[in-house]
Every structure is written in C-alpha cells, then in structure tokens.
C-alpha cells in the first residue's frame, strides 16, 4: 500500500517522452558497485519498496549532506556556494535536461510552476485564446485548467485512446489558430505513457502556441533534453526521481521567451543587486527608497522569495542527490529499471489485472487496472508482505528504482498471487 505524503514528511523530519530524447546511450556508472544500489539507501530489511514514482527515498550521501548543512546552519556559517556557482542545484539540473542555468528557476512544486506559466501567459478569460491538454496529464494541472474554464477560458481536454495513449492526431484536431498553450506530461503519472514531445512542440509552434511539459516522471528517470524536444516551459518537483524532498522544484523557461511574457510575481529574489537608501546616504532630490534591476532570467521572472526548508538544507540535499544521479547516469538508471518493468508487464496480467501502460513505454512506472482494486484483498496482502506500491480505487502502479532487483519483483509477484 502507498505511504501518505504526510507520513513521509514526518518520517523524513520535514526536510525541506519522446523518441529523440530516449536514445541516449548508457555509460558505465562512476560510482563503484553497479546496480542495484541497495546499500545507498536506508530501506529496512525485509521491506520491498516499489513506489519510487510516489516518493523516492533519499540517498545516504544526501542525508549526510543535510546533516552537515544543519551543523553549519546551527553555527550560522554561510552556504558554501552562491546560487549559480558550479555544482549548485540549478547548474546540475540544467545540465541534466540540457538547459542553461539562467533558464532555471526554483519553485515550491510542479503545480506552482504550472500556475506561474499560465499566469505569465495571461490565460484566464475567454478572450485569451484556448489551452489544449489531455486526460493523461497531471490531475492537479487539469483541476487548475478546469477551474479557469469556469471563469471563461476555453480549455480543451483530449481523451485517451482505448489503448491508454494520447493520439497526436487527436491533439491536432483540438488545436487551432487561437491555441495559446498545449499542456502535457512528458510521461504520465497514471500509466507512464510518453508523448512524442517533439511532435507536440512542432504542432504547437506551427500554430503560434507554446508547450508546457510536466516532467516530474522524466527528470532523473529517463534521458530528457529540452532542446531536442523544443519544449518552451517545463516544471517538476524533486521528491520523486530527483531524490530530493518536498517544498522545492524547478521551472524551466526557454531563454528566448523571457522578453515575451509578463512576470507573474515580484520579489527580492528577482533583483540580487537591490540596495536600500537610508540615512546618512539619502540621495538629494526625489526620494527613492530602493534601487534595483530585475534580472532577465528564469529566476528573475518567476522567483519571489525563500522556499520551504530554506537554502541551507535544500541546496545541500539537491546538490548531493543531483551529483549522485549524474555519476550513475540517467541512461544507466533507465537501463537497469527496464527489465524489471518488462517482467511486471509480462507476469501481472496473468494474475487477472489489466495492463494500461503502453507495452513500448520506457518510463519508470507500470500500471494495472482492476475494478475496485482498493477494496479487494490485494492491499491487505501487500501490506502483510511488506511490499509498497501505489494503489488507487481502480488501479495499481508499480515503480521500481535503482535499489530494486529482479528478486524484489519476484517477491512482489509472490505476495500478489
């Protein structure tokens, strides 16, 4: 059964799809030992955790980094690196998705990033054009758009096909000359369906529209390249495949677009050179309380103030986790996980569950449907067997990661059967 997020936060102490992108060759991990990486995480013996897409465990190396940061914070030592320096989270994340650090802003969550993009594009009324999304997009983003629809915005939701995909031709039928934005998930939270994001972007750009992608199930889980895809905006939290924690995420905004959109928020993080004038330095003439210059960067457009957890802990945690991911190699992470996914796709349907993940998906999740599965004996079996997967009312999602091996999959299958 799935652990509730509030329980995860208590346990951790509250520390703060596309073919062109999936063809990166794997390289040998820098860190010794290969896969699985069981010794890198504090997963208790006898417990099988197959729920990384819900919340990924934090590596030991990152926990150690947070402890050191806490010691520095207790003695009021300043952060070791200024934001933007080599090795900081923005730099590491930008490298991960082939962006510039100046195209990355911190946000509190994926939802916060999506909201900021919609606000920056001025989308909330019937006269603002239309937004196209699909039924496999993140449910929180769909909720946001449906609420805007109540206010008059033209929102068009493309239905999944019978084989649980989004057909590009269905998207094409929904897009027209008034489309301002296409919103999709690069890999669906529900079943791991992966858009051909390059095709989606080509479609949008041909109509003068932008593309926002929720990449929370791509970043860190599969090779992802914002330049190869052509995506205009993308956002993700860090508590899943980036092995971070709640309260901090990343928003990517294409550099060339920053002059075309409006700032949705204002705050002191956007103007690092800001200075206040107080006696005895009051200027002559008209009184100006502060002097500042807003940055023409993603941070200068979308950031406003300190995030949950503060820079001391978040920077330490994400720097360690993103460095760890870089050393292992995302393509290697994906290559290790894929045989586990294929085994699940082969065996679970034999137990009476319907597969809803496309057979060719290379994402980190595999989902199976069964009516009222949440009310069957399956959750009880899994809980008794100390196996953790995501179970909803009518579906079950399994998401192995780098600490899992085929023995974990066999154990899950044994408990399930």
Predicted regions and their residues:
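Residues within the helices of the helix-turn-helix
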Residues: 6
């Amino acid at each position: 059964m799935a652990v509730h997020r509030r329980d995860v936060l208590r346990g951790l102490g509250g520390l703060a799809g596309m073919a062109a992108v999936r063809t990166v060759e794997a390289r040998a991990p820098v860190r010794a030992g290969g896969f699985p990486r069981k010794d890198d995480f504090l997963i208790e013996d006898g417990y099988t955790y197959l729920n990384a897409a819900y919340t990924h465990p934090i590596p030991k190396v990152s926990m150690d980094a947070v402890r050191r940061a806490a010691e520095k914070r207790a003695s009021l030592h300043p952060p070791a690196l200024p934001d933007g320096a080599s090795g900081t989270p923005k730099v590491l994340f930008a490298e991960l998705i082939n962006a510039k650090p100046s195209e990355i802003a911190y946000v509190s969550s994926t939802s916060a990033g999506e909201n900021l993009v919609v606000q920056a594009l001025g989308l909330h009324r019937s006269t603002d054009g239309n937004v196209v999304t699909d039924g496999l997009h993140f449910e929180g983003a769909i909720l946001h758009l449906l609420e805007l629809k109540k206010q008059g915005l033209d929102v068009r939701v493309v239905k999944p096909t019978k084989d649980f995909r989004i057909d590009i031709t269905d998207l094409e039928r929904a897009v027209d000359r008034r489309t301002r934005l296409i919103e999709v998930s690069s890999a669906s939270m529900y079943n791991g369906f992966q858009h051909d994001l390059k095709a989606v972007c080509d479609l949008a750009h041909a109509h003068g529209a932008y593309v926002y992608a929720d990449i929370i199930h791509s970043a860190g889980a599969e090779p992802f390249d914002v330049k190869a895809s052509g995506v205009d905006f993308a956002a993700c939290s860090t508590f899943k495949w980036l092995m971070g924690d709640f309260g901090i995420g990343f928003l990517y905004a294409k550099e060339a677009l920053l002059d075309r959109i409006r700032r949705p928020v204002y705050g002191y993080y956007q103007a690092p050179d800001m200075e206040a004038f107080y006696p005895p330095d009051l200027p002559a003439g008209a009184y100006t309380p502060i002097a500042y210059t807003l940055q023409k960067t993603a941070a200068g457009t979308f950031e406003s103030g300190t995030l949950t957890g503060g820079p001391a802990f978040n920077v330490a945690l994400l720097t360690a986790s993103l460095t760890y991911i870089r050393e292992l190699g995302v393509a290697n992470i994906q290559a290790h996980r894929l045989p586990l996914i294929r085994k699940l796709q082969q065996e679970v349907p034999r137990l009476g569950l319907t597969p809803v993940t496309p057979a060719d998906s290379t994402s980190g999740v595999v989902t199976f449907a069964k009516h009222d599965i949440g009310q069957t004996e399956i959750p009880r079996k899994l809980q008794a067997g100390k196996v953790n997967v995501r179970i909803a009312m009518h579906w079950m999602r399994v998401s192995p990661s780098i600490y899992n091996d085929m023995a974990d999959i066999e154990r899950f299958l044994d408990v399930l059967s």
